[in-house]
């Protein structure tokens, strides 16, 4: 039986672990933190529970792509609460709200009511989204349907380039990209294919996870252990050991040694390179390229506990923009931050499948560049000093003020709040510069910002959000890519069909 060490217990590490364990590998996952799950993990404050990264998922209705993957990974027990089908995302541009509905017909009809002169163009846009999603065998889970020409074209054209070529109304152009904080898109850089996959993912169906996203991590861990694998926390890998040809094991911070026939790294590529110091199998050019990778912007979050019975539950996500355009919010200045924000409620555990009447807690999320918190890098969580706490409070008050202006009554409903910065993400997940979604895609750099799942070390592979895309579907597609290297794609597709 081959011994497999997986570094990191995020969704990529856990899902790879389950697939390999059920196919005969002896899997051990090593997690640096005290809690499993990476961006799936949750935390409690003052009696309420908050999610940190995975707030809602798509395509989880029976027969849809994510539902099939969840079934394959034996996650049929995950509770789901459907977001409003008539408006799962609400985009607010300079005070005017637009709703995005699930399903082809409702999506087109709803936007056509506000933009009747654009109906044909909306149909063209939606058809293209579906065509791109279907053209990817990985995203459609139809192995024979891969269309390389379509995939390539929309990986090298930017979101704004394609949207502007289809849609003529400038307001509608902005509405269609209004949820871009979900992938930290940048104008002229982010490929349209990224937008298409994410739009298709949520347009099919959208759900929150009652009780929190850590249910996914716990379910995968239970399944892994049932197949004989294990997850160990407080095990930060500091070195990957190699002989002259291959990796042989890892060393953790507590100086434990773990021998391995195969190593999977579910970490940011920059962290992987740090584990491979003085390893001649890795060339200097590769190290330099990894360190030069562009990363998506970080985020500042305010986690709010509401006074009981004061905040009606929002069964949708709210994207609020001060200006008519959602673009360039990451290019804020000290004077105009925040240019935009994402506002969501957490779905509490529900026993009867009903939609809650009131929210217990919610989150505000806006962009924050790492340079704003870099002076505190190297300090420990909870011990960064009074200046850091004052900085966070000032930012939180500004973000709450802006959200309250767009959503009156929000501030009055807050009983208490807590915050996180890009530094929090760096310390808990190891993502470079606290980046929300890891490595950024940039059509102008082409393959230079694409991270291969394979390395020059034959038995060392990468998985997680950096090798394909982030989010539930993006990471699981990356998992299939990585595991196909070991089991063949045919084996995995056949198992998914079973």
Predicted regions located by residue number:
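A conserved FAD-binding loop/helix module that cradles the flavin
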Residues: 54, 465-487
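Helical element adjacent to the flavin cofactor pocket in flavoenzyme catalytic cores
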Residues: 196-248
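C-terminal segments that line or cap access tunnels to active or ligand-binding sites in enzymes
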Residues: 309-420
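N-terminal glycine-rich phosphate/pyrophosphate-binding loop and immediately adjacent elements
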Residues: 2-128, 439
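Rossmann-like flavin
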Residues: 94-190
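Mid-domain catalytic core of redox enzymes
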Residues: 208, 238-357
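Active-site-proximal substrate-binding core of FAD-dependent oxidoreductases
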Residues: 242, 488-498
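A glycine-rich dinucleotide-binding beta-alpha-beta segment and adjacent secondary-structure elements
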Residues: 169-183, 187, 405-469
């Amino acid at each position: 039986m081959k011994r497999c060490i997986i570094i990191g217990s995020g969704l990529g590490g856990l899902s790879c672990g389950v697939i390999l364990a059920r196919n005969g590998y002896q899997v051990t996952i090593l997690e640096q933190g005290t809690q499993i799950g990476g961006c799936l993990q949750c935390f409690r404050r003052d009696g309420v529970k908050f999610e940190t990264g995975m707030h809602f998922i798509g395509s989880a209705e029976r027969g849809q792509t994510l539902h099939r993957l969840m079934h394959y990974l034996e996650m049929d027990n995950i509770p789901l609460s459907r977001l409003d089908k008539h408006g799962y995302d609400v985009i607010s541009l300079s005070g005017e709200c637009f709703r995005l509905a699930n399903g082809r017909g409702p999506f087109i009809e709803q936007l056509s009511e506000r933009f009747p002169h654009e109906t044909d163009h909306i149909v063209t846009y939606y058809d293209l989204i579906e065509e791109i999603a279907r053209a990817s065998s990985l995203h459609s889970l139809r192995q024979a349907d891969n269309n390389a020409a379509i995939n390539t074209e929309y990986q090298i054209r930017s979101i704004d380039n394609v949207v502007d070529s289809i849609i003529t109304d400038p307001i509608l152009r902005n509405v269609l990209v209004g949820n871009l904080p979900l992938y930290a898109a940048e104008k002229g850089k982010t490929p349209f294919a990224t937008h298409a996959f994410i739009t298709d993912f949520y347009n099919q169906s959208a759900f929150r996870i009652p009780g929190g996203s850590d249910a996914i991590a716990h379910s995968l861990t239970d399944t892994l252990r049932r197949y004989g694998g294990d997850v160990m926390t407080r095990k930060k890998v500091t070195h990957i050991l190699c002989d002259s040809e291959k990796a042989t094991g890892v060393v953790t911070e507590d100086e434990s040694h773990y021998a391995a026939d195969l190593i999977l790294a579910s970490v940011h590529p920059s962290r992987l390179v740090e584990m491979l110091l003085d390893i001649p199998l890795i060339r200097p050019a590769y190290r330099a390229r990894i360190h030069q990778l562009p990363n998506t912007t970080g985020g500042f979050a305010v986690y709010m506990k509401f006074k009981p019975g004061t905040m009606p539950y929002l069964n949708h996500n709210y994207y609020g923009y001060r200006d008519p355009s959602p673009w360039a919010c990451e290019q804020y200045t000290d004077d105009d931050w925040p240019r935009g924000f994402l506002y969501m409620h957490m779905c509490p555990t529900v026993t009867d499948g009903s939609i809650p009447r009131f929210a217990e807690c919610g989150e505000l999320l806006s962009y924050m560049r790492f340079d704003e918190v870099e002076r505190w890098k190297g300090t420990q969580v909870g011990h960064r000093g009074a200046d850091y706490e004052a900085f966070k409070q000032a930012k939180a008050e500004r973000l709450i003020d802006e959200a309250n202006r767009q959503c009156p009554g929000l501030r009055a409903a807050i009983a208490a709040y807590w915050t996180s910065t890009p530094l929090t993400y760096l310390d808990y997940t190891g993502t470079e510069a606290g980046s929300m979604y890891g490595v950024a895609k940039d059509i102008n750099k082409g393959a230079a910002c694409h991270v291969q799942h394979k390395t020059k070390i034959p038995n060392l592979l990468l998985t997680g959000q950096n090798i394909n895309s982030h989010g539930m579907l993006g990471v699981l597609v990356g998992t299939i890519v990585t595991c196909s290297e070991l089991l063949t794609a045919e084996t995995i597709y056949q198992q998914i069909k079973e």
